Structures are given as C-alpha cells and as structure tokens.
C-alpha cells in the first residue's frame, strides 16, 4: 500500500514537471528569436537605399545645371564678341579691317571649337627638328672660322678691276703680295710640345716658359 502511494506521488510529480520544461523551452526559443531579430534588423535598409538614390540623383542634377550655366555664359561671351565686331564694321562704314577668326579665337577655345589649322599644327609638331649636340671639335672650328673672318683683309673693290676681272691697281697688288707672304710665314711648329695637367690650362705653361714661340 505504501509502495502504491509512493508510485502515485512520483507520477504526479513527473506530470507536474512536464509543463515546466515546456514553458522553459518556449521562453528560450522566444529569447533566441528576440536576439536574432535585434541582430538582423532590416528596418533601416530601405531608408538608406532611398537616401543614397536621392543623393545621387541630386548630385547629377546639380552637375548638369552647372554645365548648362557654364555653357550659357560661354555663348553669351561669343554673342557679345560678335556684336562688338558688327559694331566695329558699322562704325568703319562697312569696311572690315580685322580677321574674324583671330578675333573669335579665344572665345572658340573656351567653347571647345578647334580651328581649321589644328590638324596642321599637330602634323607640324611631328616635323620639329631637334638640334643635335655639337662636339667640342665643331665648336672650336666655328670659333676659328669666326676669328678668320675678322682677320681677313678687305677684298679689292670692283673699281680697281678692269672688265676682265684683273686687278690693275698697284697699291692693291702690293697689299695682296704682302698678305700672301705673311700667310706663308705662319705654320704649325712641331718642335715644341706643351704638356699640361689640365687641357686648356695655358696659364700654368706660361709660368713655366718665359716665351711661347708660337701659338695657334
């Protein structure tokens, strides 16, 4: 009898525990649902998308409006320039004393209108000749040539020649003979060799040698 009562009590106890477990599960699942809902809140996605779309449209409209205003300003400048040219022609009694292309060149550049000679300018740029670097020998030779031009005496005038081109003036002939003899005296002597530490340093050589016999 005692055992039967004990079994009945245990059964009733287990039955009373069953609803408690069910309620605990439901509470746990509800809490999990609440947490998931707070993590993945999708209520702000739609407003953000709307704001981004509206902002991009607004920026595009503002940029287009600026372009229109800039274009209107440029065309207004061109119209004002054309009116000025018309007034100049009218004041000059219908005579055109200017080049319309040159006058409108700056305005056309502002409008992005390229003149007729644009392609020609591009072709000319490719034909630019880059000057080559001159060597030291060429520079030295050019200096010598310039010095010779300065030393060359005056050539006989046409008045001292006859019809056949022969010089007949005695004074001119003497001068020519004298200059020819002086030219024959000038020669390059290889007997004396000048040694220097640095090329072109003639001051040091002048200190060592009292006299330089010849220098070219």
Curated annotation (Swiss-Prot):
Main location class: mitochondrion
Annotated compartments: Mitochondrion inner membrane
Presequence boundaries: 1-26
Keyword annotations: Chaperone, Coiled coil, Membrane, Mitochondrion, Mitochondrion inner membrane, Transit peptide, Transmembrane, Transmembrane helix
Mitochondrial intermembrane side: 64-216
Membrane topology according to the record: Single-pass membrane protein
Coiled-coil segments: 64-93
Biological process annotations from GO: mitochondrial proton-transporting ATP synthase complex assembly
Membrane-spanning intervals of the chain: 44-63
Keyword match Hydrolase: no
Topology Mitochondrial matrix: residue spans: 27-43
Entry's Gene Ontology cellular component terms: INA complex; mitochondrial inner membrane; mitochondrial inner membrane assembly complex; mitochondrion
Function: Component of the INA complex (INAC) that promotes the biogenesis of mitochondrial F(1)F(0)-ATP synthase. INAC facilitates the assembly of the peripheral stalk and promotes the assembly of the catalytic F(1)-domain with the membrane-embedded F(0)-domain.
Assembly and binders: Component of the inner membrane assembly (INA) complex, composed of INA17 and INA22. Interacts with a subset of F(1)F(0)-ATP synthase subunits of the F(1)-domain and the peripheral stalk.
Note: Present with 589 molecules/cell in log phase SD medium.
Protein name: Inner membrane assembly complex subunit 22
Protein's organism: Saccharomyces cerevisiae (strain ATCC 204508 / S288c) (Baker's yeast)
Taxonomic lineage from the root: Eukaryota, Fungi, Dikarya, Ascomycota, Saccharomycotina
């Amino acid at each position: 009898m005692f055992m039967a009562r004990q079994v009945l009590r245990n059964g009733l106890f287990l039955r009373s525990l069953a609803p408690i477990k069910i309620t605990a599960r439901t509470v746990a699942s509800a809490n999990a649902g609440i947490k998931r809902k707070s993590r993945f809140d999708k209520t702000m996605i739609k407003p953000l998308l709307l704001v981004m779309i509206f902002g991009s449209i607004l920026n595009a409209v503002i940029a287009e409006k600026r372009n229109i205003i800039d274009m209107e300003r440029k065309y207004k400048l061109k119209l004002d320039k054309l009116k000025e040219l018309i007034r100049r022609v009218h004041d000059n009694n219908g005579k055109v004393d200017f080049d319309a292309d040159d006058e409108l060149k700056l305005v056309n550049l502002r409008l992005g209108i390229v003149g007729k000679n644009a392609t020609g300018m591009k072709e000319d740029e490719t034909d630019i000749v880059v000057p080559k670097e001159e060597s030291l020998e060429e520079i030295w030779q050019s200096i010598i040539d310039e010095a010779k031009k300065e030393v060359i005496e005056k050539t006989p005038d046409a008045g001292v020649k006859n019809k056949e081109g022969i010089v007949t003036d005695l004074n001119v002939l003497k001068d020519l003979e004298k200059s020819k003899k002086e030219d024959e005296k000038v020669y390059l002597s290889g007997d004396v060799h000048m040694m220097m530490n640095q090329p072109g340093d003639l001051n040091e050589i002048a200190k060592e040698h009292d006299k330089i016999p010849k220098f070219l």
